[in-house]
Amino acid sequence: MNINELKTKAMQRKPASKRASQTGKKLDLSKMVRMNFNENSYGMSPKALEVIKESAVMGNRYDFNATEIKDVIAKKHGFDSSNVLIGAGSSALIDMLGVTFLEDGDEVVLCMPTFAAFVDMAYVNGATPKVVPVNENQEFDLEAMLEAIDEKTKMVVVVNPNNPTSTYRSAGDIEEFIKKVPENVMIVVDEAYLEYATAPDCKSMIHLVKEMDKPIVILKTFSKIYGMAGVRMGYAIADSEIIASMSGCPAAWNVSIMAQKAAIAALNDQEFIEYVKENIVKGREYITKELEQLGCKVFPSQTSFVYFDAHRNPAKLMDEMAKENIAMGAAEYSRISVGPMEENQLFIEAMKKILGR
């Protein structure tokens, strides 16, 4: 039986996904310090955890519309609920974007390296990723992206701050970029890590959904600062016509009652969110300082991870770190998630050992 022949042509030509792939070796993460997937080691709000337990009794009931969580999110950002779409993580929303708006012959302009889900989105739906390298500062090269747009371009994607490079482009830069994108090209801005940013000019573009007459989609997730990666919860903010179109996807009905209730509780527990952010920022600064003292080049981070050049092969460093029972990530350079201080210190001690310092 040749299953490959049964696949769609788009899936046959799609390269292997890099989503969640961190090493060629299979690791038993249960025995390791997990610093490879940008997970929030502080977990979710205790209030959210309690609500999950309480709402489990409703797990036998459908919730077709997710009305309550949509209303809460809409109020938080100053929109109507018709501007909000809920998904099982922002990854599900990315998939919905592709199913709704992409087809054979379309191109998606984006920088690399970035979140691999966007590359998958293009290929799965018959489109082609038109890749522009990040600039020398490991930032999205917005200027080169504009030059790459042509008559085949259906969508442009900006991840800000970017994963895996941890860098950002200023609100002013992104707004100018959006102004210059042709009106028939959809603009997707993924703000998964924005809540970790401390730079004054690293801001959300949500307001542009109202202010500009352009097809702008803003993606948000509960997987990062809200610590709900395993719960699967995210949302999109866009013009109501875009939301209505995406709502026609089968995947638009994919979020459990427990996830919705937990998300509401998490949004209402800002004290816990501030606690997480404060500790992640401290850990980020600690790792940055220690790596620089070890002679590594560290790219300024506005996220929950640090991207750095240890002047050695990133895949080799990742495997060496695995021998120290620490799981880390790699792209063109190395990436380490920021955790509680004891985890950060274990990572630095392992780096000193590996680098012979």
Where in this protein do the model-derived segments appear?
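PLP-dependent enzyme catalytic core of the Aspartate aminotransferase-like
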Residues: E320-K323, A327, A331-R357
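PLP-dependent aminotransferase class I/II
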Residues: S45, P215-E292, K297-F299
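Conserved PLP-binding catalytic core of the aspartate aminotransferase-like
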Residues: I280-V281, E290-E324, V338
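Phosphate-binding glycine-rich loop
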Residues: A66-E107, N125
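PLP-dependent aminotransferase-like
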Residues: T100-V158
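Active-site pre-lysine segment of PLP-dependent enzymes
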Residues: L142-E151, P164-I187, E191-S223
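N-terminal "arm"/small-domain region of PLP-dependent enzymes with the aminotransferase-like
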Residues: M1-N60
